A protein has these predicted regions:
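Conserved catalytic-core motifs of GNAT/GCN5-like acyltransferases
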Residues: 78, 170, 183, 188-203
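Conserved active-site alpha-helix within GNAT-family acetyltransferase domains
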Residues: 129, 134, 145, 149-150, ...
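Conserved beta-strand in the GNAT
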Residues: 60, 66-75
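Conserved N-terminal entry element of GNAT/NAT acetyltransferase domains
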Residues: 1-12, 209-213
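Active-site rim helix/loop that mediates acceptor-substrate recognition in acyltransferases
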Residues: 26, 35-58, 64
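A conserved short alpha-helix in the GNAT/GCN5 acetyltransferase fold that borders
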Residues: 143, 152-160
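Conserved GNAT acetyl-CoA-binding A-motif
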Residues: 130, 159-172
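Conserved acyl-donor/pantetheine-binding loop and adjacent beta-alpha core of acyl/acetyltransferases
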Residues: 78-135
Length: 213
C-alpha cells in the first residue's frame, strides 16, 4: 500500500507539481492529450507563482512515486496578482509569443499562451470577506482518501492564523464533483461567471471565529 506524505513545498517540487496540474487540466480529468506540445503551460499560471510568492501556503502531497497533489493558497489575492503582473507575467510574455490567427482554431496550449498576455484577475465581491484564495489538484491515485480535505484544511488554518477572514476558489462549471466536494467543506456559491467550458463558479468560506477542522 502506498504511503502518502503532506509537507510544505520545496523549489525542487516545481516539475512534479506542474505535472499534476497538466494531468488534472481537462476540467479535473487528464489533460495530457491536450498539452503535449507544452506540458508546463498550465502550471506556469496555476502553480509556479504560488510556489514562488506563497511558499508557506503551498503544500505538496507525495508518495513513493513522487508528487501526486498540491494545495496552494494566497493570503491577499490583490497583492498576489500584483506580484504576478509585475514579477511573473513579464517573463512568460517574453518567452512565449501571443498566438495569432483565429482564436476558434487555437489549441489548448495556444489558449493558455494567450492567457499569459491577457490575464484575468477577477476577484468576487465582497472582497473584504474573502481576500484569500485557494487552488488544489490531486492525481487519481491520491483521490478518495481524504487528502484533499486535509490539505485544504491545513492551508485554511494557516490563513486563519495570519488573520484572513475568508477564502474563495474557482470551480469550472464542468467539474461537478469538485463543486460538491467544496460544498461539503463549507464553501458557498458567490457568483457564476461565463458559461459552459468557459464558465466558472466562485465559492467562498468564512474563516472567522472557527477552526476549519
Amino acid at each position: 500500500m502506498s504511503e502518502f506524505t503532506i509537507r510544505l513545498a520545496r523549489p525542487e517540487d516545481q516539475s512534479g507539481a506542474y505535472h499534476v496540474c497538466m494531468k488534472t487540466g481537462n476540467f479535473g480529468q487528464d489533460g495530457e492529450p491536450f498539452y503535449r506540445e507544452d506540458p508546463d503551460a498550465l502550471g506556469r499560471i496555476f502553480v509556479g507563482p504560488y510556489l514562488a510568492f506563497e511558499p508557506e501556503l503551498s503544500l505538496i502531497l507525495e508518495d513513493e512515486v513522487g508528487v501526486c497533489g498540491y494545495a496552494l493558497g494566497a493570503f491577499d489575492s490583490r497583492n498576489f496578482f500584483h506580484r504576478y503582473e509585475t514579477e511573473w507575467r513579464p517573463k512568460l510574455c517574453a518567452q512565449f509569443h501571443e498566438p495569432t490567427g483565429d482564436p476558434a482554431m487555437w489549441s489548448r496550449v495556444q489558449n493558455v499562451h494567450s492567457w499569459y498576455h491577457h490575464p484575468d484577475y477577477f476577484t468576487p465581491e465582497p472582497y473584504e470577506q474573502f481576500p484569500s484564495h485557494l487552488h488544489i489538484d490531486l492525481l487519481e491515485r491520491a483521490q478518495g482518501r481524504g487528502f484533499g480535505r486535509r490539505m485544504l484544511e491545513q492551508v485554511m488554518d494557516k490563513l486563519r492564523e495570519r488573520g484572513s477572514p475568508g477564502a474563495r476558489l474557482g470551480v469550472s462549471m464542468l467539474n461537478t464533483p469538485a463543486f460538491g466536494f467544496y460544498a461539503k467543506l463549507g464553501f458557498r456559491e458567490l457568483i457564476r461567471v461565463g458559461e459552459g467550458k468557459d464558465g466558472c463558479i466562485y465559492m467562498g468560506k468564512s474563516l472567522r471565529n472557527e477552526s476549519v477542522r
